[in-house]
């Protein structure tokens, strides 16, 4: 079974038209729902391996491009961190509920998206009846070398004066994955960027430790995934977050030898990671609705 891919725009918290795309099952009204938030500098189109994993499973998949990323407007890499991203994600949920009748989804966040997904879960998990939270390579605690620590210190000092000033993130692309084709594709993709503003960078770093401190408030099922050789986001952040979560159902999956983008690692390793994701997500989504009781078809937004 192949997905029906659609795309369009939805209004962010301040009315900014943000890009989204979705992959709908053959009978969307009966499908279960997975929502994805990408990481810093990238976009929703880089999650095709995840999409392919659920082909034939009656799972609708929805992903947005955060402001300042991908096909969404805004200065590249500039936002007020969670102060923008979490309200935007809530607007996305509202849009999906209205336009696609999305109910009881699983929320997946990678890297920066992991921070956003955790922040959203702490505020809205009950309101939106989240079935589960999944994080991969969550950027709760960045792995900073000496030069990056200096940049972070200077950025914190300058943020009040020039919050939207953007600087290069400065991370080697070779730290994303062991798969050379993934690195080449990332480098050639015009929708990716390597910039971050002072307010966004410092805001995300501050948010990470704060979310770990609040992790005991996470009550829903949680799957925490992280590559043990991740040199972009330290796995200690994911370990501490998982340990602090008070959810009665939580799982920590650490992958020896894997870099930051565990869904984009070499084919053999990628399949192992995706199999774990597939197992968890299907176990925590509702049962497929019987065909005779399914809701009427959802309205959609054409690509723009």
Residue ranges of each PLM-predicted region?
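Alpha/beta-hydrolase-fold enzymes
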Residues: 112-197
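Short beta-strand/loop motif that positions the catalytic acidic residue
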Residues: 218, 224-226, 230
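N-terminal cap/lid segment of alpha/beta-hydrolase-fold proteins
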Residues: 1-26
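Catalytic active-site module of serine/aspartate enzymes centered on a nucleophile-bearing elbow/loop
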Residues: 251-304
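Conserved alpha/beta-hydrolase
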Residues: 51-75
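Active-site glycine-rich loops that stabilize anionic/oxyanionic intermediates
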Residues: 38-42, 228
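Short alpha-helix in the alpha/beta-hydrolase fold that links the catalytic acid
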Residues: 220, 234-243
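Catalytic nucleophile-loop/oxyanion-hole region of alpha/beta-hydrolase
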Residues: 41-44, 70-104, 272-273
